[in-house]
Amino acid sequence: MKKIFLIPAILFLSFATAGATEQDTVNRCAAIIHDFRRMPERAIPRDVLRHARGLAIISVFKAGFIFTGKGGHGVVVARTRHGWSGPSFIATGGAGWGLQAGAQVTDYVIVLNNNGAVRAFSRGGNVTIGADVSAAAGPLGRTAKGAVAPTAAVYTYSKSKGLFAGVSLEGAVIGTQRDSNFRYYGRPVRADEILSAIAPPPPGAAPLRRALSR
């Protein structure tokens, strides 16, 4: 029975990401950053972004009825001496039980507040939020407390149906997409090479880097 209900969710998630290229993912992440910057009084405080050592940006598709499936793709970037790094591709996914029908898309921004958080994503494996890096729901608004003196290695934010929120992502597992990095950079490249800017950002990363630098 569980497999019967899970199949529609898996099919939806497959169709939702089918045909999406790495450049599509980068463009989507640039649009997410624009959205989060557009209403600073309701979204991520400017000081949080100004002091960030890196950002993980991901869109998660969730669908199903009774049994739900979810999956998401995105990128992580780091601040270097020469500006923002190129994107290293990441993904998350899973299945669970819930009284939910239909489909939902939620955009997440994970602010990497220190170099330790950047190193966790640079290892090129899986990062478990709350275990590999301490996490807290991020402060919201222009005058939010914690904007200058972070209380956790990462702050987590979400936007769904136009509503911004600081959210808990405790237990979420995010993994490096080595195949996507290979396709985007045209050669085998490690996450640490990307996030340290040893691997130069491809021209297609320019819109995302501009969005981050505003």
Predicted features along the sequence, with ranges:
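Positively charged n-region of N-terminal signal peptides that target proteins for export
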Residues: M1-I4
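Small-residue-enriched, tightly packed secondary-structure blocks
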Residues: A20-R214
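Hydrophobic h-region of N-terminal signal peptides that target proteins for export
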Residues: A9-A18
